């Protein structure tokens, strides 16, 4: 049995520890960059082009806020960065994004709106009786008048002459479609995107993106040895090798045991076969995630807007209840879908994958 223990240790190191340890190292910015790789309570990841690129002015303040500096529009808080889609969600530090939009100018920055939508901003006297479903913009309203905004031209015209048009401007929007009523989203977040440098391919393959050299504006993907992260294909191969190694180890141990106990040969093989047959059920029973792994998934406390960043709606897909202010939601890392933290925690303990797209972390 001494030989069996040595074989077990060898296979364990070869097929489990070495591959998985190598595959789990995170990618980093260059060593010359002193900024942290994550910043703020939302732990916004900071990597190229937001480090090492002169046009992407991203800072982590002393108050632990992730701040984006736009040349013509000032500073904004960063809520979320999608490196694969090359999109960034920002908001106003004073929680009055609608006011910033009245003078918003994206010139001189590498960003552009995903869609440009023409909005009409109006002011109406408070004496004017309006339906309760006409949401005003509180931070722009006062004791005598209320401020409204809509991308529906006909709706804006119907408010005249009781209300006055303050301004008509193009506003960066998530969708090209006009709203049918007054907007309640202008104070939530602003979606911008960048097309250059193009690092989408690197991000999809979990490779590090960066300049080819200090003198060239061109970028390239750096391999696993430099970035410390392997592509999906390599990770899949390593996992397959680990499984094969486990099977070989198991069969080897059974063979050695049978060889050392000849009197029990007639029933040892069927017992081993029965054990092998039971393995898939055991694997299926343990497909859920443990609590420590679930706790590593990003959470966020919703604000007054009740709308999480990204393409998520305001309804939890699991319990079908609308989110409310101050509720905590949790995000699935691979697809950024979010749910009530208490709902998704129960789900992940059983299934271990996103209930919407079934993606799971390798």
From Swiss-Prot:
Transmembrane segments: 234-254
Subcellular location: Membrane
EC category: transferase
Pathway: Protein modification; protein ubiquitination
Keywords: Membrane, Metal-binding, Signal, Transferase, Transmembrane, Transmembrane helix, Ubl conjugation pathway, Zinc, Zinc-finger
Keyword Phosphoprotein set for record: no
S-S bridge residues: none
UniProt keyword Zinc present: yes
Family listed: Belongs to the RING-type zinc finger family. ATL subfamily.
Protein name, as recorded: Putative RING-H2 finger protein ATL21B
Taxonomic classification: Eukaryota, Viridiplantae, Streptophyta, Embryophyta, Tracheophyta
